Design a protein with these regions (language model features):
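Predominantly soluble domains enriched in secretory-pathway, periplasmic, or organellar proteins
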Residues: 1-200
């Protein structure tokens, strides 16, 4: 397991065995020795050959850095948006989706960067909400989800169409009697059929 230390510009490779955790290696990251560049999000690609790290504290933009899991050495890097944060790789599209958290910027809609991890090229950016975080890919690899912290919305991105497909207003939701959250605020962006109270 790779764990980032945002205030220390290091990544620890941890090994779990029985009831013990061992730090196998501590990897120094970043390119400016006198500045904290803020390693934030980490993900390993589906084939296990590479791991990716977002360096959030850019000037002004952050970076996505690609490492080899065999050597833990830098393979390539690319510039993303303001404070790139959490990310995952879709097993269906092969693309990496990284939210640009924009922690220090103005409270306006930010973006999800879509990156080809083979060439380390940012293909496009998709506008979502203010301060998006918590990027997750659906099990089938067809959708990317993130929550905009300041606008209180869940965004669903079509991983193939590269556009927002639905949004859910989280601030207006109430718990049902059975403890399950209502999904009646989920709005389709493309007219797709509504499901269990999701609005088109």
């Amino acid at each position: 397991m790779y764990v980032a230390s945002e205030s220390d510009d290091t990544v620890s490779l941890l090994k779990f065995e029985n009831n013990e955790i061992t730090e196998v290696e501590r990897i120094t990251v970043g390119t400016y020795p006198t500045e904290i560049e803020g390693p934030h999000g980490i993900t390993v690609d589906p084939n296990g050959k590479f791991w990716y790290l977002s360096l959030a504290h850019g000037n002004p933009f952050g970076k996505l850095v690609k490492y080899s899991t065999e050597s833990n050495e830098v393979v390539d890097e690319t510039t993303l948006g303001l404070f790139p944060a959490s990310m995952q790789v879709s097993t269906t599209t092969g693309f990496l989706y990284c939210v640009n958290f924009n922690l220090h910027g103005s409270m306006k809609p930010s973006t999800v960067s879509v990156v080809d991890p083979v060439t380390m090229t940012e293909i496009t950016t998709i506008t979502t909400g203010s301060m998006p975080h918590g990027s997750r890919i659906s099990p089938d690899g067809l959708y990317q989800y993130s929550v905009a912290m300041m606008s209180g919305e869940l965004f669903e991105v079509d991983a193939l169409g590269l556009e927002v497909s639905r949004t859910l207003d989280l601030e207006s939701k109430m718990m049902k009697k059975d403890g399950m959250k209502s999904m009646d605020g989920m709005k389709s962006m493309d007219g797709m059929k509504s499901m269990d109270g999701m609005k088109s």
